[in-house]
Amino acid sequence: FPAMPLSSLFANAVLRAQHLHELAADTYKEFERAYIPEGQRYFLQNAQSTGCFSEVIPTPANKDEAQQRSDVELLRFSLLLIQSWLGPVQFLEKAYANELVFGTSDRVYEKLKDLEEGIQALMRELEDGSPRAGQILKQTYDKFDTNMRSDDALLKNYGLLSCFKKDLHKAETYLRVMKCRRFVESSCAF
């Protein structure tokens, strides 16, 4: 992110987060369509709702809770969520090498790195300007399993994609809340 006005930094970060969240949601839906029998979807979705690693990070659960946090806190949460996926996403391409729909996974990593840099640029702007070492995650998500013939691998990857979608939704929400707080505009209703 080159030097630019704060409003542009926020606008770019929100657009990137929104795009990644849409990509994660589309990938999840496509995986579900391709691999999960329709009769099992509801049961499996409920079973995975508590299995996300990010739930151990004390992040705001919704927009109202996010509005009660400072911008710097929300940026830190967003950064932690993004960084927790940098490693696992690199295995998406390997897990789905022969699947056309998952062919964008190599770009997902680049897009996550780009969003990470954007969030770090916002943190530098909002803090005292000096780069601070962020909280380093000792634990992240498991890698995606490349053995697509195994039911266990399918269920694991389905759960990971569900968490990926949820975490990117959180990061997008936090960035939107901050942007709307600072720059009131018509697109703040979400």
From Swiss-Prot:
Q: Where does Zn(2+) bind?
A: H19, E172
Q: For the modification Phosphoserine, which residues carry it?
A: S105
Q: What Gene3D superfamilies does the database record attribute to this sequence?
A: 1.20.1250.10
A Pfam family the protein falls into: Hormone_1
Kindly give the SUPFAM superfamilies that the UniProt entry links to this protein: 4-helical cytokines
InterPro entries named in the record: 4_helix_cytokine-like_core (IPR009079), Somatotropin (IPR034975), Somatotropin/Prolactin (IPR001400), Somatotropin_CS (IPR018116)
The GO terms describing molecular function are: growth factor activity; growth hormone receptor binding; hormone activity; metal ion binding
Q: Give Gene Ontology CC terms.
A: extracellular space
Chief location: secreted
Could you give a single Gene Ontology term from the biological process aspect? response to nutrient levels
This protein's record includes keyword Disulfide bond: yes
Per the record's keyword annotation, is Amino-acid biosynthesis included, yes or no? no
Disulfide links within the chain: C52-C163, C180-C188
Sorted keywords for this record are: Disulfide bond, Hormone, Metal-binding, Phosphoprotein, Secreted, Zinc
Where can this protein be found? Secreted
Report the function annotation for this chain. Plays an important role in growth control. Its major role in stimulating body growth is to stimulate the liver and other tissues to secrete IGF1. It stimulates both the differentiation and proliferation of myoblasts. It also stimulates amino acid uptake and protein synthesis in muscle and other tissues.
The UniProt entry's sequence similarity note says: Belongs to the somatotropin/prolactin family.
This protein is called Somatotropin
Q: What broad taxonomic lineage does this protein's source fall under?
A: Eukaryota, Metazoa, Chordata, Craniata, Vertebrata
The gene is GH1
